[in-house]
Amino acid sequence: MATPTPSSSFSQWWRDYRAILTLAALFAVFPFILPYTALANEIMLFALAAAAFDLCLGYAGVMMFCQASFFGLGVYAAALTLLHLTSNLFAAIGLGVLASASLAIVIGFMATTRSGSYSVLLTLAFAEMIYFIAFQWSGLTGGDNGLTGIKRPNLEIPGFFSINLQSSLAYYFFSFVFFIAAFYIIRRITLSPFGKVLMAVRENEQRAQAIGYNTRLYKMLVFVIGGIFMGLAGALYCMYICFAHIHYVHFEISGNIVMMVLTGGMGTLFGPVMGAFIIVLASDLASALWDRWMLIMGGLFIFFVLFARGGLWGLFEKLLKMRPARGKKN
């Protein structure tokens, strides 16, 4: 039996990781080529939220409309931590993630008691309830005025180093580290045996149950994992804008994340990142040019749903497959 050579091992490693390395390189240059750093930061953090939702919908077939609840709770938990508990950067991020994960456990437990449209409607009901609580409990959330006075902490390890994160660019690259690490973890999940079971549940839940898998448990787990990473995106976003508002628990955020996944191509992981780039960038440019810019976004979404169901990533893969075919003819 032939043993793998170092060169073949390296080739395999490169095939496995070149997409993530390319993704990291692209996001590393975004702040320098986009009009302003805030736009690059928004694209990156919504790309993380979209990738987390793609794990739920694209890989497990779990549809939900409570993405904004996880993202927004991450925003609020980080904001309240910095305002009332501590100025520790990692504590704010950790509590944002913990709050969203806790909510995901509750919603996931309830939503997985039903299937199909009933499960989706339960997530929508929870999302509306969270929004109503945030709106009415103005003493805690600031209501329609939001929470202001949030100060972005610096990155400090006592006795080792301190990095000033007040610069938008410095904070972008701080978030960039979390983004790449989180994306890598999500990708490894999709390639793991756990990820294979999720895909089996997506394709045929009854068959997965018949061979012994507890499909409800797997769907609950993917709810929690998705909630963790959406909460992480929300916590990082809060410390960038230094503001928390009920807009971030509004259904519009959930709708935007769904659009990002379907536009980019669900079940691809890289597609939703591409979708986030297109949706956030197009929203920013179109809103500056036309008051009715949402019509453009709606038209774009309809086009991809009707004529390009594989999304942008599907179109990209088709173009790549066409290149060798042309080479063979020559």
Question: Which residues does each predicted region cover?
Answer:
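Cytosolic-side transmembrane-helix boundaries in multi-pass membrane proteins
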Residues: M1-A28, G146, K196, E203-E205, ...
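Hydrophobic alpha-helical transmembrane segments
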Residues: Y17-L21, A40-M44, S69-G72, F90-L98, ...
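Residue-level recognition of pore/gate-forming positions within transmembrane alpha-helices
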Residues: F27, F46-A47, V75-Y76, V97-A101, ...
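Single transmembrane alpha-helix segments in multi-pass membrane proteins
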Residues: P31-H84, F109-T123, L198-A210, G265-L269
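Extracellular/periplasmic helix-loop junction at the C-terminal end of a transmembrane helix
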Residues: F126-N164, G195, W313-F316
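Helix-loop-helix "hairpin" substructures at the membrane interface of multi-pass membrane proteins
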Residues: Q166-H245
